[in-house]
Amino acid sequence: MKAVAVGTLALALTCLAVPAFAQASNDYCQGKSLTLVVGSPPAGGYDTYGRLVAEHLGHFIPGGCSIVVQNMPGAGSLRAANFLFQQGPSDGLTIGMIQPNLALDQAFNSENVKYDLRKFQWIGRIATAVETTVAWQSSPVKTIQDAKTHEITLAAATANGLTAGFPRVMNAIVGTKFKIISGYGGTAAIVLAMERGEVEGGHMGGHSLLSEKQDWVTGNKVSVLVQYSQTRDPGLSSVPAMVEFAQTPEQKKILSLFAATTEIGRTLVAPPGVASDRVAALRAAFAAMANAAEFRADVEKRKLELNVLSGEALEQMINSSLDISPSLAKVAEKAWTGQK
């Protein structure tokens, strides 16, 4: 995915100019350590990005500081989000990396939600987490329009996860006929099921598809039916984003909520009470890190995706996505869970 990552980065960095005022002052971190709370267990994808940031970000915070990763898994980052929101120190020495599914938990008014994403202070996004649905070459389904007239079996990991949730949303809102078969352990099992002909299609992460299974796309082994995003990823520019299938403003609002979860991606946040000048310093440090040649080289070495977005742009996206009426949020929740 080398060409994709570099091209995406070039587009994104135009928005990440480093504010001079933040560079010139605010050395609150000097001689101290900053804690990065990662709402995922060690060795996973979010942990990998968290440790990448921990190695580089401190060099760009005025005064310089070391960064210590603290893993706080639980309920898809809900535990970490609640901690940061309710107990996160306001001194700018604790930040977090939490999973984007938290937007759905908040929109669905889940009982364990103690946070409000709109009150977090967003530092920046490192990478998206765009997901796709693909159909194997033997399937008559080549487009979403085909999937509205022909039933197609899709492999999914669990009944409650995103590999089943996104296709269910397409069924409920767009009118596709995805028959979801859950119980496959993860991406590797889904890939094997398609190759063996057990199912006609499945759910794939966009980065996995382009980096590990690029021959599927270039060799026409699969048709990529949809990417679950608000805008088309540069690496999947010919694949429609899910919001493009909205026929009404209500449908667009619902689909935008789901699409935002992948666009939020791997992001850094600060607790609500951190002073504005320290938030500005963290945002400037993030922008400087994203522009740094050594950081980009490390990303390429690790074969990771890089699609950065400023904290200000993230804040706007989240506020817009969560600006949804209770009645539409209920429709969205039923679509996600498969309720009638």
Per-region residue spans from a language model:
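Extracytoplasmic "Venus flytrap"
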Residues: 35-50, 73-76, 155-162
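Ligand-binding clamshell of periplasmic/extracellular solute-binding protein-like
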Residues: 53, 75-77, 92-104, 125-127, ...
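Hinge/capping helix and adjacent helix->loop/strand transition within the periplasmic-binding protein
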Residues: 28-30, 34, 59-63, 83-94, ...
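Bacterial N-terminal signal peptides
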Residues: 7-17
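A ligand-binding cleft/hinge motif common to bilobed small-molecule-binding domains
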Residues: 100-112, 164, 168-173, 201-245
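Extracellular/periplasmic bilobal clamshell ligand-binding domains
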Residues: 310-340
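Short beta-strand-to-loop elements that line the ligand-binding cleft
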Residues: 66-74, 155-157, 178-186, 204-206, ...
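Sec/Tat signal peptide C-region and signal peptidase I cleavage site
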Residues: 18-22
